[in-house]
Amino acid sequence: RQMCIRDSLYIERKMTPLNLYLDRKDLTEEEMRQAIDDLGNCIKQIASANIFPGDMLHKNFGITRHHRVIFYDYDEICYMNERNFRKLPTSDDPYAMDTLSVAPDDVFPEQFEHFIVGKRHLKQMLKELHPEIMTCEYWQQVQRDTSKGDISVSYTHLTLPTRSSV
């Protein structure tokens, strides 16, 4: 007897949540840099597959034993065209209060540095390695590319893991 399973493939990987990995005391600066670089690459590859990850806190990413950063929080994902990437508005009036009119689908990439990674030196590392992900122009270009059908699918940064803190 033969059994054929079609159109279904499930991969399970044990990984360490990225925030716990980056908090390890035995981690070298180079290992941190490699993880932050792969985090930026992961975000960009997901976007180029026409997926906006939504909640990009580093606790929503894991790192495998082969030191690959993987995104695993799918509850806020959406298509790239479902978001409105905007620059933070500025005012010429020095007496104006900082106010912001925000629609439900507005995203301000300039704010990403405040929540993707928490520690100052890791934020700086991410900004040095992947400054484009903090710009509205980058995300709008990805939207234009994906709307034309220029979609790059890479499964190296998407999986259904089992969380662990190995």
Locations of regions flagged by a protein language model:
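Conserved ATP-binding subdomain of kinase catalytic cores across diverse folds
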Residues: Q2, R6-L18
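Alpha-helical hinge/cap motifs
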Residues: D55, N60, T159-P161
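Conserved small/polar residues in nucleotide/adenosyl-binding loops
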Residues: R1-I5, T156-T162
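C-terminal region signature
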Residues: A96-L158
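Glycine- and acidic
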Residues: L18-E30
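Catalytic activation segment of kinase domains across protein kinase-like and atypical kinase folds
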Residues: K59-T99
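Conserved kinase catalytic-core helix
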Residues: E29-G54
